[in-house]
Amino acid sequence: MTDETTEILVAGANPYPVVIGRGLRFDLARHLGSAVSKVLVVHPPTLGAAAAELRESLAGQYEVLLTEVPDAEAAKRIEVASFLWCIMGQADFTRSDAVVGLGGGAVTDLAGFAAATWLRGVRLVQAPTTLLGMVDAAVGGKTGINTAEGKNLVGAFYAPAAVVCDLDMLISLGRNELLAGFAEVVKYGFIAEPEILDIIERDVDAATDPESAEFRRVVELSIGIKARVVGEDFTEQGLREILNYGHTLGHAIEHAERYQWRHGAAIAVGMVFAAELGRLSGRLSDDAVERHRRILASLTLPTSYPLGRWQTLLAAMQRDKKARGSLLRFIVLDDVARPTVLAGPDQSLLFAAYQEIAS
């Protein structure tokens, strides 16, 4: 275990650092800056004590307001966003104030959306406390909430001032929550960095130990890939689309299951579906498809979905924000680290891929 701090820059029109290390949640003032007066810390119920510690560390410099929101996807509702707007309005929040998202991906999505929309944008610092938040949700500048029609349909691209990843927060994270976050880590391995897959295959226990060098390595590799892609294509006009590997079906599963499935579990199944889609379209080898199943299963992530739900999933995918007009778009692989877009595949091909993952 190292105490060194790593800083990865997300380039672009509004560049920002992603800082990785230990004990960093007590160093947020450096990223909030001296011009800020009030700080709204948005956190879930499970992080009340951590939020109070954060308030104590900031109290000498800022007026700190702690606001508890529901856990997980229940936070990403218009009613909760409206609640945050009311809090900021009652506190006379101005453009010289700031929002901190302290929590998992759903909380940072919500906090980012509130910051992006209040007065058309106030300063935002993200402090993700889950693996999913660190390697994915908090890093890319996507913010948003869900609607009855689907996931993340209302939101904004909004760059934070910084993303602060305190690895110490992962030590006490529940095992299932940690492993669910590994779905996104595995995604990076398949679309861009085979070293991630090699580390997991070599020693899955070390790779998933938050205090190990192997764990830190896969986290830094994952964030580095996300930062590079987002820096080149912040608003998802081209390259960034590769980050959606496994997400078209994955988001449909989340919607079909009323968000009772963990995001990582849904994305794991979505990646196996995308791999089968690649194989059935003549792009990906049988061995590469089975490698998906083997690695995900080693992380106790699901690789199949119940039979008989296809029409529900198809309807959800057709409402997906990644679709272009009436055409569904899937990221598939020609090989490991060779992603490409499969646009408008025939529904018979999609159903055949679904049958391969149906249990």
UniProtKB/Swiss-Prot annotation:
EC number: 4.2.3.4
One GO BP annotation of this record: chorismate biosynthetic process
Superkingdom: Bacteria
Pathway: Metabolic intermediate biosynthesis; chorismate biosynthesis; chorismate from D-erythrose 4-phosphate and phosphoenolpyruvate: step 2/7
GO molecular function (one): nucleotide binding
UniProt entry keywords in alphabetical sequence: Amino-acid biosynthesis, Aromatic amino acid biosynthesis, Cobalt, Cytoplasm, Lyase, Metal-binding, NAD, Nucleotide-binding, Zinc
Binding site for NAD(+): 71-76, 105-109, 129-130, 142, 151
Cofactor: record remark: Binds 1 divalent metal cation per subunit. Can use either Co(2+) or Zn(2+).
Cofactor(s) needed: NAD(+); Co(2+); Zn(2+)
Catalytic activity: 7-phospho-2-dehydro-3-deoxy-D-arabino-heptonate = 3-dehydroquinate + phosphate
Membrane spanning stretches: none
Function: Catalyzes the conversion of 3-deoxy-D-arabino-heptulosonate 7-phosphate (DAHP) to dehydroquinate (DHQ).
Protein name, UniProt field: 3-dehydroquinate synthase
Protein's gene: aroB
